Amino acid sequence: MTTHYIAGSWQAGQGEALQSLNPVTQAVVWQGQGADASQVDAAVLAARQAFPAWAQLSLEARIDVLEKFAEQLKQHSEALAYCIGEETGKPLWESATEVTSMVNKVAISIQSYRERTGEKSGPLADATAVLRHKPHGVVAVFGPYNFPGHLPNGHIVPALLAGNCVVFKPSELTPKVAELTVNCWIAAGLPAGVLNLVQGARETGVALAANPGIDGLFFTGSSRTGNLLHQQFAGRPDKILALEMGGNNPLVVDGVKDLDAAVYTIIQSAFISAGQRCTCARRLLVPQGAWGDALVIRLVEVCKSITVGAFDQQPAPFMGSVISLQAARALVAAQSELLAKGATQLLEMTQPQADAALLTPGIIDVTAVADRPDEEFFGPLLQVIRYADFDAAIDEANNTQYGLAAGLLSDSRARYQYFWLRSRAGIVNWNKQLTGAASSAPFGGIGASGNHRASAYYAADYCAYPVASLETASLALPATLTPGVTL
């Protein structure tokens, strides 16, 4: 059974039973047993033993392996895209773009490493000042289920490039994607022990996070789990912790001329990936009055016709399923709780089939809800809040513990500049979907949304630490000795 990849060999798990399911059909996609604590220990030890040789390779030698990995991804792109769709439920057109992002991450990471963490030097009067960067050592990477290939790849690629060795624990909901990805690394010639895969759920994750042999942990996932990791690593300045978490993201709509363009951008912001992107719009802030009424009516009208279906359905749907039946039922329950608090249903989010994790888009007006929960409802549920003036909209947009993404739809550049200056988020977009971000730019947020800028251009910053040196080829006395010293 090919479950875990440790020290260059595949082995069966010794922990709890695991299986991943197709979210729509509930067919078993993958099954095995998770890694127990002893296997996690073995993976960390294998990474530690592989570290000296990998770190001492030239940068060009490591780049060569990364570029071969990118070629393997291209060769297996169809199989990877199919697997991503099958395990996550996202349509094939969307899972194919994820594989493309994985390929592109290699070149971006190489560029980022050279520009942000390469070697720099400059002359001084009697020496040379040199800045170099060194890898941390052994790092754990925890991956999410919503982008099971792209997001962990955004940690793993720059970590390996910098000279680290990795122990990778993917989401227990998407183990097959992780297995296929690791096979691409093996085919690229990555030495044994440099990348180790441990599958598993909570038991495996707890063992890996607590292992004293790791020098850092790179995490993408929920704020709840990220906060627990932050508490666990408190008082451990010797460990590097990079967290990319969620958001209760606001999208503010100003009066724009093209109503349908606004509606389309809202749909792309709120409902792409069935609302399972950390940057998806969760709160839609709409001005009070006739124009705002017309926008909401048109949005509801268009959303009624959005197609929802299985990942391989033809013609292709816009939305696939959410990750699991459990997730679907939790979202329907969250909608009911908001209604009980006084919200108004504009478009009901429904689960058409009780045995499938398919949900239709939901739109709910929560303006009248006094105690709106500051939560990330990770699915196709959009909350509408009506505002009286632009300053009130900005105040409401910032009324969250999170700070990942925020956006403005407006025909006024002055409005955008005003919004940008006051917006509390790591990503601020103007007249573009909230889920859009340039891979060549930093990605991440502030507050409860995380600390470092994970899985993108600034990932190089936390994958290596700077070493400043003063250097001269020969030791010599200075021209003038300091007072009080006689030779």
From Swiss-Prot:
Biological process (GO), any one: arginine catabolic process to succinate
Pathway where this protein functions: Amino-acid degradation; L-arginine degradation via AST pathway; L-glutamate and succinate from L-arginine: step 4/5
GO molecular function (one): succinylglutamate-semialdehyde dehydrogenase activity
Residues at the active site: E244, C278
EC numbers on record: 1.2.1.71
Alphabetical list of InterPro entries matching this protein: Ald_DH/histidinol_DH, Ald_DH_C, Ald_DH_CS_CYS, Ald_DH_CS_GLU, Ald_DH_N, Aldehyde_DH_dom, SuccinylGlu_semiald_DH_AstD
Keyword Coiled coil belongs to the record: no
Positions contributing to NAD(+) binding: G221, S222, S223, R224, T225, G226
A Pfam family: Aldedh
Record's keyword terms, sorted: Arginine metabolism, NAD, Oxidoreductase
Catalytic activity: N-succinyl-L-glutamate 5-semialdehyde + NAD(+) + H2O = N-succinyl-L-glutamate + NADH + 2 H(+)
rRNA-binding is among the record's keywords: no
Function: Catalyzes the NAD-dependent reduction of succinylglutamate semialdehyde into succinylglutamate.
Family to which the UniProt record says this protein belongs: Belongs to the aldehyde dehydrogenase family. AstD subfamily.
Protein name: N-succinylglutamate 5-semialdehyde dehydrogenase
